[in-house]
Structures are given as C-alpha cells and as structure tokens.
Amino acid sequence: EQTQLSHLRAIIAEKASGRPIELTLKAEDSSEWTFMRPRDYPGVLADLMSELPWDRPLRAAKIHTAEDGTLVLDTFEFGEPLPFTSNHPQYEAKVERTLAYANENLPDWTDSQIRNYFASCSEDYALTITPFRMANHWQLVQELTGTDGTSVAIEAEDDPNLSRIIVAVSNSTRRSMLQRIATSLSKSGINIHRAYLDSVDDGANGWITLVGCVVQGPDGGSIDENSPLWKEVRGDLLRLKWLDQRTVRLGYSFKELTLPCAEIITALSDLINQYLVKKNPYAFNPTRLDTLVRSNITLAISIASLFQDRFNPRNPLQDSEYNARTAELKELIVNTVDLEDARTVFNVMLDAVDAVKRTNLFIEDRYALSMRIDPSLLTTDDRPECPFGVFFVHGRDFNGFHVRFRDISRGGVRAIHPKGIEQF
C-alpha cells in the first residue's frame, strides 16, 4: 500500500505540472525501481529493461499499462527472493484456499504436492497469485522439473481483445529471460499490457523462472492459438534460452528475418569459417563474415530458406527443385554481389548447405542446432585426410565438432574456452 501511495503521489505531481508522466523512482537502497512512461507501444518493456543495472539479480517484475495506453508503470525488484514458509501469518489461509480450489477443479493435485509447491515459492509470488493461476503454473512446472527445458502456453483472458502468454524456463537468468521475451514479442508486433516475473525452487536441479504476459496482437485483438503468428511466436519463445546472442542480434536487426533463419545463418557462418580461415584468416574472420552477411542479408536469408525447405519433414524439397534453386542462387551471387570475398563466402555457404546430410532443425525441444555433414567440406591442403563422419553443433556461446575417422565410436571430449571472439 505504501508503494502504491508513493506512485499515486508521483503521478498527481506530474499531472499538476502539466508535463508528460516520465519518471524513474528508486528505493533508497536501490532494491526497487519503478518506471512511469506516458505512452504504451510494442517494445516499451524491452526499452525500459535496457536501463536496469546488471550488477544485481532481478527478483521480480510487475508490468502495468493504463486501459487507454496513456500510462505505463513498471516495477522491478532486486535481490534474492524470500521463501514462503509456514511461519508467515497468511500461509495457512493461502494453502487452504488453494486446497479448496484443487479439490473442486484439479483433484489430481494432492495435498502434499500443493504444500511442497508452496515450499518452493517465493513470498512475493505466493502472496499475490490466485489458486487458478497457481494451478496452471504448477502444471507447467511439472513438465520442466529436473530438466533444462522451456514450456510455453497461451490462455484466453476475460477481455476478448487480450491473451495471456506464460513462459516457464529452467535455470535461466531471470533478467535476461524477461528481456529476451519482451524483445521477441515486440519484434512480432505484440504489445505487453501487463507482465509478471517470478521463480520457483526446483531443488537440486536449480530453479524455474515464470514469466506471464497479458498481451494484445498486432491487429489490436487477442492471439488465435491456431494462427501462423502464434506458431512462429511459440517456436521463438521455446528456443530463446538456447539462442546465441549473435543470432538474437542478427534476427532483431532486420524486419524480414526470422529467428530460425538467423540461427541457420550464424551456424553456417561459423561452419564455413572453419574452411575459409585456412585460406585467409584475416579476410574471413568471424567479425568480417558477419559484416558481409549483413551487407547481403536478402541473399543470406534465401540460402537459409533453402536449408529450411530442403529438410522440412512435412514437405522436403525434391532434388530437382533443390538443384534449380541452388543454381539460381549461384547466378544471383555472380550478378549481384560486388566483393570477391563476399562471393566466396556465399558460394561456400551454398556448398555447406549441400554438404548437410541431416539436421535437428525441426525438433521442437532441441538445445542447439546440429548437422551431420559431408566430411569432404572441411578437407584442405592442411587437412588432407577425409574423416569417416563429421557432426557440427552450433549453440549459445559455443560451436562443436564430433569427428570420426573410422566407423567406430570412441569416447572423449575436448572443450576449449577462447579468450575472445577472434580467437574463437
């Protein structure tokens, strides 16, 4: 109540001054930040989060928007969450209300499971959540407990123009996950009206972050769970935790570029770097490859789309169509790409697509993008021996190769942590 009163006083003071409401309020110990902004728009949450400090863990977030869109009030709390224990004066009342709800609506949710779930909750979360919402969260948590995965759900709201998106993520930094979700929804033209960030303890496995967003679609209405928009958004949300930061930056830099395409582009760039670096380590270093890709993004998207269509399990490209599209792209490279280095990059990228034999691109719960490739792609004068088989794996902050020189499996992993991107 004291916090709400301070917010009201600040709003009244700004209204009286005649100025737009644009304030940032901080607690004396900086444990709580509140942003007030005069206008709501897709991406406002991501913009505000970029102003938050990185040196303190984000405990909770509460995002609110006025019905007419003329005021945004976002509160962020820092520090480690306090557990909700039986010593709290409201503990028994909260548990009893949840037990009563479960008895009527979710009989499989037992007394012991409910009490164990409360024991894993933070105090802020347990005191503010309704039994209905807690039951939904518990079901999502059950899907994830003991894993490092992600669950995504969409629900209808009482207001027919709104939908609720719930994302549960195991062992992800709360701040980075909320920011990635906010940015992803903004890229899709989805406006966040309200949002909540909480987490529950997952025992020895770590913790599970819960992000709930009450949203409005690009057309100003609710989101149809059977629509192509939701299919794309859901796929992006499931993969957000595992995407490399370069993939995210690339995907959000171009309106026409989807995150799956961006992931393919960064993966292929890292793959061909292993071949091109033997030709010229300066002309084909990772930074320059990224620059050349961005300068020819339409061509890069076309190559990524060829990769997608070739391995689409529902309708894979026939060899004749694949060969025709490859020939068209090679002609496009000759006619439209100016720099010789850039032509080399995109021709080798097409060779890489052709060398891929299998991929896990379309597996929904994958942790990284992997490919089985023709080993001859990586043979050079310095590496004349052609292996029996090669697997390439591209993920968040890593690339990996599994190389077999015979048709026999041997154990062993070598992990190298480079000092910087150029050494990488």
What are these regions (language model features)?
Residues 399-400, 405:
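Function-dense linear segments that define catalytic or interfacial modules
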Residues 1-392, 397, 411-422:
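Non-catalytic interaction/regulatory segments
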